[in-house]
From Swiss-Prot:
Bilayer topology annotation: Multi-pass membrane protein
Keywords noted in UniProt: Cell membrane, Membrane, Transmembrane, Transmembrane helix
Protein's recorded name: Uncharacterized protein YphB
Cellular localization per UniProt: Cell membrane
TM spans (from-to): 3-23, 38-58, 103-123, 128-148
InterPro entries linked: YIEGIA
Pfam (any one): YIEGIA
Organism the protein comes from: Bacillus subtilis (strain 168)
GO annotations of cellular component type: plasma membrane
First-listed, main subcellular location of the protein, grouped into a coarse class: membrane
Domain of life where this protein originates: Bacteria
């Protein structure tokens, strides 16, 4: 195995560099705490080490070393459970919660990124062993670019058009455009809502998009991201000041009502545009319709 020290080191470096990039903190601010980052960096190092030794172990016919991959898979599933449990507990103390769909998406991402690290380390080490160090560098760069692609994902601006609409009252009823949001009877609460509230209409670009934004978890993710960046003008025990998203049953549009501390509609539109499309919320009913048409045809 001493002949493979440099390939293994190259694979570990490529894997941990990829994990560090994928660990960057954005406006959603998770993970924010240093100890949480240390945990994920340590797991990334383990994943990189496992990926780097796969090819040398196979070439040396050390097949028992491959069994450690099963232990790694179990460990990374535990990471997913850890993230889910931690975020669920944290969510109960948020003024505007993430929602279980958003939390599950984050947990899946943290598990899957460890597998990306294993793949990066494996490919880099293999390129070094069979070709050269320059081939290993190219392999590492390709894996890094793939990681960037996986990090970006799809966002709401890809599936909806977003328009700012000032909230209004019709009697006690709060409306965003022509979509009824909720009933507010107290005049002082109505005044606060008109002063601080913002409304947005999300118009789906196709039928699949309409089915996706109808998901309650996807709507909650929108409310959380806007409130997380711009703040929220409310405290616990004030249901009349709760951000809400409601759907127009006729055309599939979604109205979003928020009460931010910072009243800046243009920034809010940018935030909503960059809300991730949650994997568990994506629906593609037209694919079923197309397949049914093929069967019938």
């Amino acid at each position: 195995m001493s002949d493979y020290i440099y390939p293994i080191i190259a694979g570990v470096i490529a894997g941990i560099a990829t994990r560090l990039y994928m660990l960057k903190t954005d406006y959603r601010q998770y993970p924010t705490y240093v100890h949480g980052k240390v945990i994920h960096i340590a797991l990334g190092l383990i994943a990189a080490g496992l990926g780097a030794i796969i090819m040398p172990a196979l070439l040396q016919e050390e097949f028992t070393a491959i069994t450690f991959l099963t232990l790694a898979a179990t460990q990374f599933r535990d990471v997913r459970n850890m993230e889910r449990n931690t975020l669920t507990q944290m969510d109960s103390y948020e003024l505007v919660s993430r929602g279980s769909t958003y939390i599950e998406g984050i947990a899946i991402a943290f598990e899957s990124r460890n597998y990306i690290v294993i793949f990066t380390a494996l490919l880099t080490t293999s390129a070094y062993v069979f070709l050269s160090i320059w081939a290993a560098v190219i392999a590492a760069v390709v894996c890094f670019l793939l990681a960037m692609k996986f990090m970006s994902g799809s966002v709401l601006k890809d599936i909806v058009d977003i328009e700012y609409i000032k909230p209004r009252f019709d009697g006690p009823g709060l409306f965003v455009d022509n979509i009824y949001m909720m009933n507010i009877g107290l005049p002082e609460k109505q005044e606060l809502i008109l002063k601080h509230g913002m409304g947005f209409i999300l118009t789906p670009k196709n039928f699949n998009s309409a089915a996706t934004i109808a998901n309650l978890g996807q709507r909650q993710a929108i409310l959380f991201d806007v409130s997380n960046v711009l703040g929220v003008y409310r405290d616990s025990g004030e249901p009349s000041l709760t951000p809400i998203a409601k759907r127009d049953l006729n055309d599939g549009r979604v109205a979003v009502f928020v009460l931010p501390q910072i009243h800046h509609p243009e920034t809010a539109v940018q935030i909503i545009s960059n809300v991730p499309t949650l994997e568990n919320a994506i629906r593609m009913p037209t694919e079923f319709i197309k397949n049914q048409d093929k069967v019938i045809g």
